[in-house]
From Swiss-Prot:
Organism (species): Phenylobacterium zucineum (strain HLK1)
Gene3D superfamilies: 3.90.1200.10, Phosphorylase Kinase, domain 1 (3.30.200.20)
The keyword Hydrolase is assigned to this record: no
GO molecular function: ATP binding; homoserine kinase activity
Protein name as catalogued: Homoserine kinase
Length: 323
């Protein structure tokens, strides 16, 4: 979450006039993340998050994102509930940009997940996948495997400036993953950004997930791979097999994996690391000056890519533990 678009008191009052949420009591920007402008809003009717959607989020995708969040909330999964105005509309406009007001989800994210947190996160991810079954809308993953080659073509000079020789290494990753990307694995709605800052806990127990603005239809095990990269690497860059085993075991306690899904996790994790390296590389150079946001370091994911290149069995060892 971040702030790129400022909103005046008058603009907020005009927006809230369409809702039955009561008068505003407090309103402040949230300076985290890199994607949209987010504000913590407290009114007489409760606590909410106001999100103003910036350039990366396409307006035509917003009905999918908001519809999914409402679907999950109505099917027993804890996520923010988009608020509808008096006319039944969830999607509004402020400063010429689309926006939405979503209920505040209680709980805390963790900066340094423990093995127990990883197990709970795995359970939560499987619960999300199950709750999303039957959601009638569809959205392709525009940051999936097919997008990486053209994305890298645009960013290869930035990669070389970041670290001399890196462009050639990443080019090999792109080609290798295109050759080895798995086919025929179970698909469904995935979160696609299941990082610790998007997952909430209460007293160590999974309490819900937020930030569904990369959600799409893709290989479900790819969501696990994203999570393995996000949750199971230590600060020194090493892969924590115990944490990975806990995450996969937690997932399988709710939704068992097939042998094919488990076997594919190393290549899926390699691909997930490439996806986040590329988008971080883009953000590193594209984040506007003066925004209340610090872009995330792409070299963190360059180091994770190196682990997947040289030691793919580490992920497989982690995946095998749920048996």
């Amino acid at each position: 979450m971040a702030v790129y678009t400022d909103i005046t008191d008058d603009e907020l009052a005009k927006l809230l006039a369409d809702f039955d949420l009561g008068a505003p009591l407090s309103f402040k920007g949230i300076a985290e993340g890199v994607e949209n402008s987010n504000f913590l809003l407290e009114t007489e009717g409760g606590r909410f998050i106001l999100t103003v959607y910036e350039k990366r989020v396409r307006a035509e995708d917003l009905p999918f994102f908001l519809g999914l969040m409402r679907w999950l909330s109505e099917h027993g999964f804890a996520s923010g509930l988009p608020m509808a105005d008096r006319g039944g509309e969830m999607l509004k406009t402020v400063r010429g940009k689309p926006c939405a007001i979503v209920s505040f989800l209680p709980g805390l994210s963790v900066r340094r997940p423990t093995v127990a947190h990883c197990r709970e996160a795995g359970k939560g991810l499987a619960a999300l996948h199950n709750a999303a079954d039957g959601f009638p809308m569809r959205r392709e993953n525009d940051l999936g495997q097919g997008a990486w080659a053209p994305m890298f073509e645009r960013l290869k000079d930035d990669a070389e400036r970041l670290k001399p020789g890196l462009a050639e290494v990443i080019a090999r990753d792109v080609a290798d993953l295109a050759d080895r990307w798995p086919q025929g694995l179970p698909e469904g709605v995935i979160h696609a950004d299941y990082f610790p800052d998007n997952v909430f806990f209460k007293e160590g127990v999974f309490a819900g997930a937020i930030d569904f603005y990369f959600a799409c239809n893709d290989i479900r095990a790819y969501d696990i791979a994203v999570a393995l990269n996000a949750w199971c690497f230590e600060a020194d860059g090493s892969f924590n097999i115990t944490a990975a085993r806990a995450l996969v075991a937690g997932y399988e306690a709710v939704r068992p994996l097939s042998e094919a899904e488990r076997a594919a996790l190393p290549v899926l994790a390699h691909g997930a690391a490439l996806r986040f390296f590329l988008t971080r590389l883009h953000d590193w150079h594209a984040t506007p000056a003066g925004a209340l946001v610090k872009p995330k370091d792409p070299l963190e994911y360059e180091r994770k890519l190196a682990v997947h290149r040289t030691s793919p069995d580490l992920v497989l060892f982690g995946a095998a533990a749920a048996e």
